UniProtKB/Swiss-Prot annotation:
PANTHER family: GTP CYCLOHYDROLASE 1, GTP CYCLOHYDROLASE I
UniProt EC number: 3.5.4.16
InterPro entries according to UniProt: GTP-CH-I_C/QueF (IPR043133), GTP_CycHdrlase_I (IPR001474), GTP_CycHdrlase_I_CS (IPR018234), GTP_CycHdrlase_I_dom (IPR020602)
Pathway membership: Cofactor biosynthesis; 7,8-dihydroneopterin triphosphate biosynthesis; 7,8-dihydroneopterin triphosphate from GTP: step 1/1
Family of this protein: Belongs to the GTP cyclohydrolase I family.
Organism phylogeny: Eukaryota, Discoba, Euglenozoa, Euglenida, Spirocuta
GO molecular function: GTP binding; GTP cyclohydrolase I activity; zinc ion binding
Residues annotated as binding Zn(2+): C4, H7, C75
Protein name (Swiss-Prot/TrEMBL): GTP cyclohydrolase 1
Catalytic activity, as annotated: GTP + H2O = 7,8-dihydroneopterin 3'-triphosphate + formate + H(+)
Annotated control of activity: GTP shows a positive allosteric effect, and tetrahydrobiopterin inhibits the enzyme activity.
Subunit (UniProt): Toroid-shaped homodecamer, composed of two pentamers of five dimers.
Species the sequence originates in: Euglena gracilis
Length: 80
């Protein structure tokens, strides 16, 4: 989970990561570690998605990378 920087309430969900390797191949634990590293910060979902994709792009320079983040935000759930 992560914390919404606007409301200081948690949001949680799933992160889907896909990439086309160009030489280097990352293990599943490395992808999870990248997602967790950025999720620990005060975040908004859009920036979290961009940061994960950018980190993978910078570190292994794949032919392509896609990141989809699907979350439930408590700031929206509490409003009803």
């Amino acid at each position: 989970f992560s914390m919404c920087e606007h409301h200081m309430l948690p949001f949680w969900g799933k992160v889907h990561i896909a990439y086309i390797p160009k030489g280097k191949v990352l293990g599943l634990s490395k992808l999870a570690r990248v997602a967790e590293m950025y999720a620990r910060r005060l975040q908004v979902q859009e920036r979290l998605t961009r940061q994960i994709a950018s980190a993978i792009e910078r570190s292994i320079q794949p032919l392509g990378v896609a990141v989809v983040v699907d979350c439930c935000h408590m700031c929206m759930v509490m409003r009803g």
